[in-house]
Amino acid sequence: MRAARRGLHCAGAERPRRRGRLWDSSGVPQRQKRPGPWRTQTQEQMSRDVCIHTWPCTYYLEPKRRWVTGQLSLTSLSLRFMTDSTGEILVSFPLSSIVEIKKEASHFIFSSITILEKGHAKHWFSSLRPSRNVVFSIIEHFWRELLLSQPGAVADASVPRTRGEELTGLMAGSQKRLEDTARVLHHQGQQLDSVMRGLDKMESDLEVADRLLTELESPAWWPFSSKLWKTPPETKPREDVSMTSCEPFGKEGILIKIPAVISHRTESHVKPGRLTVLVSGLEIHDSSSLLMHRFEREDVDDIKVHSPYEISIRQRFIGKPDMAYRLISAKMPEVIPILEVQFSKKMELLEDALVLRSARTSSPAEKSCSVWHAASGLMGRTLHREPPAGDQEGTALHLQTSLPALSEADTQELTQILRRMKGLALEAESELERQDEALDGVAAAVDRATLTIDKHNRRMKRLT
């Protein structure tokens, strides 16, 4: 009977120590019945995180020396294992407590992943699906990005943040998104300028064509005929204009680069790499900085957002398989707003990513206005917190029961961030107005060029 149970859990892949000892008839370890306070606190922290991925696997239960089937779940800050039979969380710990992640073999045969925590607690995971390499690459990526994040972020992950720090972090994130949007608008303005230069060049070419057609339409005995059509005087200016028009595209216009775990068509094979967002498209590189694929902006058919940390990019083809890549990254929340600006009509938020849409239901103007008023109100309450002379006791009681006010350092930092955001918003508004005028000019130039080309076509038909 015991051998049959072992065959059910990972086909006998247990640690080779004291196999003859039987376990409790209940089959539930004593540690599981009485979880410690650290375990409960970790579960509460993880409940606030977004689940990035879940894999079926088995976990080696050290007290009973047997393997338990369940689900391994990863969030941006935590890792946990839940059993299939009872739905109970056996293991739950933050990524910041991990010391080492290794690929090992259980019983020298079965491939496993071992995770070493602070305090020398070692966890064994085996029978990982779709494969051990996929699970290892994704967990290692998020662990590494957490360690490489801002200094002190890992050490202060478990320390509760004050209201001023939370508000400062919120405003800093809003400022970064506003900077990314302003950068996209700047490159978009460069593209409009390039289009306008191309239209000016086309208009000058049409003027040359008009003179050539006039030369051809004049009779042979006309004494004022010239030989403009035999010599191309516009060769040198054309070269200069073409070089000028291609100037913005030579810089490639890199918006953002992030590390990512990349899979091509299938999820069973992944590799670490990098996603680069350009003005003209998207580039995917491997860990050796070799270009795997480049999506031109007009070639991207759809971008599906599976979660705040996972997207898939697809380009459809007729008669051959589609070109599709799936990317998982800890920095993906920074890229999704930029992709929404560039590929607004091609983005699709799936069920697990609807939290992004709910977080951005209001318009940018409403959000900036609400954030501005909220921060101004908080800073106003911080700066003016002297009680009135007539009601000292009631005000003191109110201050004791209310939330702690902002510190002077937080107030100054918030003031600087708000000032920068206001300047960025004004610059973005002026850039949008300039681009609206440029679009009107482009539309007028296109209409003039269309009329001129139609007129030249009619004149050429009369000549033939």
Curated annotation (Swiss-Prot):
The t-SNARE coiled-coil homology domain, residue ranges: 154-216, 401-463
Disulfide bridge partners, by residue number: none
Taxonomic superkingdom: Eukaryota
Keywords from the UniProt entry: Coiled coil, Cytoplasm, Membrane, Repeat
Keyword Electron transport applies: no
Localization: Endomembrane system; Cytoplasm, Perinuclear region
Biological processes per GO annotation: exocytosis; synaptic vesicle fusion to presynaptic active zone membrane; synaptic vesicle priming
GO molecular function, one term: syntaxin binding
A GO CC annotation given for this chain: perinuclear region of cytoplasm
Annotated region described as Disordered, given as residue ranges: 20-42
Subunit structure and binding partners: Forms a complex containing SNAP47, VAMP2 and STX1A. Associates with the BLOC-1 complex. Interacts with BLOC1S6.
Family classification: Belongs to the SVAP1 family.
Function in brief: Plays a role in intracellular membrane fusion.
Name used for this protein in its record: Synaptosomal-associated protein 47
Biological source species: Homo sapiens
